[in-house]
Structure formats: C-alpha cells, structure tokens
C-alpha cells in the first residue's frame, strides 16, 4: 500500500471516529403494538437531528436483538435510506405521524446504494437488526405506542 493510500485510509478512519465520538445518541424505551396486538419493547437510540440521522448505524457491526435506532423528524415526508457504510443487514420500518406502520424493507443489503423509501409520508423510521420484523411480527396494523 502506498503512503498516499495509507494516509487517506488513516484520515477516513479518524474522520469516522470523530463523528461517532462526538455523536450522542439518547437511548430510550420504545413500545410497539405489533400485528397481533402484542406489546413489544425495544431499546432504541434516538436520531432526531440532522447530524445523528446522517450517522445512523454507519460502521456498526454489533447490533443486539431487541435494540435499534429510531429516526424522528418534525414533519411527515417521503423518507429515503441507503446502506452506504453500514456493514449490518437491517430491517427498516416506516411509520406515519400517528405511529402507524406504513411499510418495511427487510434484510437490507450491507453497503448497498439502493434507495429504500417509505411508500407514504413518514415521520418515524425504525431500524432493527435483519429478521426482527418477522420475529416480532412488525407489519400491517403495528403501531408505535410510546417512547420513554
């Protein structure tokens, strides 16, 4: 590896580390009523500003089951995601302003640049480790109940 390439790689690693070290995700408990009206609890990191939303799960390889990231906006709009710099396969679940399920993209492809979009305007987006939607039955009629 040339010294130029090594320098560039070092810079990228340092840059990503500095982003993560300065990012402070607040952890909260999320309560969802699933498709069978059963209550499911998740510990989520809240991404409620541009900086945190831009980081998401980028670079993370260890996402324990029952944990996730909840993206929150002040308004409803069509939301777009991609998996660039995200090494873990995820389920990405979109909810409307009232917390009702819109759609889910299951088992996303790590590092993919494919567009993952809500089918309707969304205010909340939940990212969980791949397979969680199926395991916890998070489909039609699922609803966010509470975030503490």
Regions found by a protein language model. Name each.
Residues 9-10, 51:
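Low-complexity, intrinsically disordered regions enriched in charged/polar residues
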């Amino acid at each position: 590896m040339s010294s130029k390439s090594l320098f560039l790689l070092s810079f990228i690693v340092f840059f990503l580390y500095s982003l993560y070290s300065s990012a402070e995700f607040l952890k909260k408990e999320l309560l969802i009523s699933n498709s069978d009206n059963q209550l499911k609890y998740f510990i989520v990191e809240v991404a409620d500003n541009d900086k945190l939303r831009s980081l998401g799960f980028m670079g993370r390889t260890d996402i324990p089951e029952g944990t996730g990231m909840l993206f929150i906006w002040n308004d409803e709009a069509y939301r777009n995601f991609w998996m660039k710099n995200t090494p873990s396969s995820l389920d990405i679940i979109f909810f409307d302003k009232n917390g009702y399920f819109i759609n889910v993209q299951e088992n996303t492809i790590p590092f993919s640049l494919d567009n993952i979009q809500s089918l309707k305007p969304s205010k909340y987006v939940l990212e969980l480790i791949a397979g969680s939607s199926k395991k916890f039955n998070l489909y039609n009629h699922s609803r966010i109940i509470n975030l503490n």
